[in-house]
Amino acid sequence: MAIKYTEENGQYSIDCTAALWSTDEIHKYYQDVANTYGIIGFLCDVDFAIETHSHILLVEYKNAAIPGAAHPERFNPSSENKLENVAKKFYDSSHWLYLMGKDKPKMFIYILEYPAGNSTSRLMVRNKLQQRLPFALQSKITGVGRKIIDDVKVVSISEWNSDAELERYPLQPVGGTAT
């Protein structure tokens, strides 16, 4: 059975059929208007979580280069506010994954498309994002031997679809083929 999730703009879908487990439903729990799970609407979440044999991939998708994107020229993925918001999605989603028993090492992947985006700007975003994720924390706490996070990547859709591991979960235009 095919397992595909469509991103919030309805223009791209990710095929998670090859995953051991996956979800796009963390948001449903965190933003429950009836507060069934507590008053936790302040929590942020990644768009997709994908379990591989070795990792849990926490995937955040932002595409300011699609037709109809609101003010793409104003989108600045390197701003302090944007970086902190994206990093918060990793931390907040980790709680839900822990409760689900998904305790494999994490990889945070930020799929980022925007008008001025290129591999150099994505690398700069990655380096700034890495400073906000728990890499330093886990390296300074000795004697435990556990990791919260193994890697962070900031990739374009094309880079996602050509990555040796990530291409197993193709990201494609709805009704089309990968670009």
Task: Report the location of each language-model feature.
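Basic, amphipathic N-terminal segments that precede the first structured/catalytic domain
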Residues: 1-46, 53, 143-146, 167-179
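Short linear motifs at secondary-structure transitions and domain/linker junctions
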Residues: 20-25, 33, 81-88, 128
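Short, mixed-charge, low-aromatic patches
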Residues: 41-50, 81-87
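Residues at beta-strand starts and edge strands
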Residues: 44, 55, 104-106
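Conserved catalytic cores of phosphodiester-cleaving nucleases, focusing on short active-site segments
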Residues: 48-50, 55-65
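Catalytic cores of nucleic-acid endonucleases
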Residues: 64-115
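Short, low-complexity, polybasic intrinsically disordered segments
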Residues: 107, 111-164
